[in-house]
Design a protein with these regions (language model features):
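Cleavable N-terminal export/targeting peptides
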Residues: 1-27
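Conserved radical SAM core fold
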Residues: 36-41, 121-128, 164
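Outer-membrane beta-barrel and related beta-rich outer-membrane complex signature
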Residues: 44-46, 86-88, 128, 169, ...
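Active-site loop-helix segments enriched in His/Asp/Glu that coordinate
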Residues: 131-134
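Acidic, His- and aromatic-enriched active-site or binding-groove loops in soluble protein domains
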Residues: 136-144
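Internal metal/ion-chelating core segments
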Residues: 148, 153-226, 230
């Protein structure tokens, strides 16, 4: 977006807000969120004895509008690395532009709620379409979302174009789309919050051999002090055959104390077998990494965005503790292997401290130590994050 277009956007928004304040019946509510984060640089280019740090800031201002059965939500966002060259900090020049992270409206139709525009779309807590809040930008989709409440739970149907290829192919079959259905069912006979999820997604790529369907299910349930979180998903097409599996067993004491909960987990992501014609690597193209696989971005198992990777076989042990001064402490131990189990990547320990300073302001500090299996070095990652919400 050019500076001229940016000013035009702000002028239009200002005019719109003035109209809101001069008597229209539309109800509205403002919100704001600013997140500052300092983190260490884990690039292999950082030389021995050198220290490299990065300062990130993400600012969001939101406007929620309600007029009868119709509502709209706009979230304007600015994401930057402080001091980046294109910020022109301290220089009399234009800077990077803000953008709409979300901009959508809702309206009812019969028993459904229709949502159209640009929006976040995390499907529960599953691993295929996860909330990507760690990223300094975040992930938004564009398209149509249909929601419906049913006696047994909730159903979501979505159609999301991700790449429009008209400038190259002028052929709808060459566009990239993500279409799917997600069903959530509450398990009322078990602990509060217990749910079962079923989902089916179809990913249409401009290259037909990279198109595939994903079918999966996830359960999060508890019986008194015992908890289970498990997920299984299958990706299939003429050229792709991959799967993902996860089993996590937890214990939560009946009486609140120093230990909030303990989890023992196993995660599996299939890797590609180079001796076959098919691609067996499971793609988490829209998934999250830090949420499940530790905080250190070790290059050999950092992302699983395609089908050509080695996969992952991970064992982990996690404790959530009520630490000093009403601080929550997450302690996590990870043991990483390739999907076939033949290659040992390394071990990781995470210490994540979270504290609500007071209403609207929270502080988070994390330490991650990674020991690669192929040498005796200890790699480290440190971050400090302050979040303010209004």
């Amino acid at each position: 977006m050019t500076p001229r277009n940016t000013f035009s956007l702000y002028e239009s928004l200002l005019t719109f807000f003035l109209i809101l304040d001069t008597g229209l019946s539309t109800e509205y509510q403002w919100s704001a969120n600013i997140r500052s984060r300092w983190k260490s640089d884990t690039s292999p280019l950082v030389g021995p004895g050198s220290v490299s740090t990065i300062y990130e800031m993400r600012s969001r201002i939101g406007l929620y509008l309600l007029n009868g059965p119709i509502s709209a939500n706009f979230i304007l966002q600015d994401s930057r690395i402080l001091g980046a060259e294109d910020n022109y900090a301290g220089v009399a020049n234009t800077t990077v532009s803000s953008f709409f992270h979300q901009a959508y409206f809702n309206f009812p139709y019969r028993d459904q709620l229709i949502q159209i525009g640009r929006f976040e779309l995390p499907l529960g807590k599953q691993r295929i379409m996860s909330k990507n809040n760690w990223n300094n930008v975040g992930r938004s989709f564009e398209g149509v979302l249909i929601k419906e409440k049913l006696p047994f739970g909730e159903i979501l149907i979505f159609s999301l174009p991700t790449i429009e290829s008209k400038d190259i192919y002028h052929n709808d079959q060459k566009d990239t789309w993500l279409n799917g259905i997600y069903i959530k069912h509450g398990l009322s006979s078990l602990n509060n919050g217990s749910i079962a999820e079923i989902y089916s997604m179809d990913f249409q790529d401009s290259i037909s051999t990279l198109s595939y369907s994903t079918y999966g299910t996830r359960v999060e349930a508890g019986i008194r002090t015992l908890m289970l979180e498990s997920e299984y998903a299958l990706q299939t097409s003429k050229k792709i055959s991959a799967n993902l599996a996860s089993v996590n067993l937890g214990y939560k004491p009946e009486i609140d104390g120093f230990v909030k909960n303990i989890w023992l987990g196993y995660d599996f992501i299939s890797g590609d077998d180079t001796s076959t014609v098919e691609m067996e690597g499971f793609s988490k193209y829209f998934g999250a990494g830090h949420k499940y696989h530790g905080f250190y971005d070790y290059i050999r198992h950092k992302k699983f965005i395609d089908h050509a990777h080695e996969g992952l076989r991970e064992f982990n042990l996690k404790w959530n503790l009520d630490f000093l001064f009403e601080t929550n402490l997450l302690v996590a131990l990870h043991y990483f292997n390739s999907g076939d189990g033949n290659t040992h990547y390394g071990q990781e320990m995470d210490l994540i401290f979270k504290k609500i300073i007071f209403d609207g302001i929270s502080l988070e500090q994390g330490f991650a130590l990674y020991r690669p299996d192929n040498d005796d070095s200890i790699l480290s990652f440190i971050y400090l994050m302050l979040t303010t919400s209004l």
